[in-house]
Regions:
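Sec-dependent bacterial lipoprotein signal peptides
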Residues: 1-15
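Short loop/turn and low-complexity linker motifs enriched in small/turn-promoting residues
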Residues: 17-130
Length: 130
């Protein structure tokens, strides 16, 4: 019995760690939004790192609020093919101080039938006003 339990648990852990979003239905696409804090790099190779502060940030697709960054990072959502606008807005309890994460950001994507697109949206910390 313990051997069976151990095998079941290891299978569950492997499935959780190596997760890939399911393929979209025919004629549709799947978009996964990966929210991160932009800490440097170049436009071609941004250095974008996970930040737990972004978990509650709202994700808007084509102007409609569609959940939070935490909701979108695993399986994303099924969308129609074509061009879409992604916006990520951080909830503010108070004004941002210099260096605090993050300023709202966005991205444009074009989805194709059968595609699973993982789109990174990098949000910057508030810069100094110098």
């Amino acid at each position: 019995m313990p051997r069976l339990l151990a095998a079941a648990l290891s299978s569950l852990l492997l499935a959780a760690c190596g997760h890939e979003p399911p393929a979209p239905p025919e004629g549709m696409a799947r978009l996964v939004v990966l929210c991160c804090e932009l800490v440097g790099g170049t436009p071609e190779q941004p250095d974008c790192r996970p930040n737990p502060a972004l978990n509650r940030a709202a994700v808007y697709i084509d102007g409609d609020e569609r959940g939070t960054c935490a909701n979108w990072r695993r399986d994303g959502a099924i969308l129609a093919t074509g061009r879409h606008v992604i916006q990520v807005k951080v909830p503010l309890d108070q004004p941002l101080e210099e260096g605090e994460c993050c300023i709202d950001a966005g991205s444009y994507v074009t989805l194709h039938a059968g595609e699973v697109l993982k789109q990174q949206v990098g949000l910057k910390a508030l810069a100094s006003s110098d």
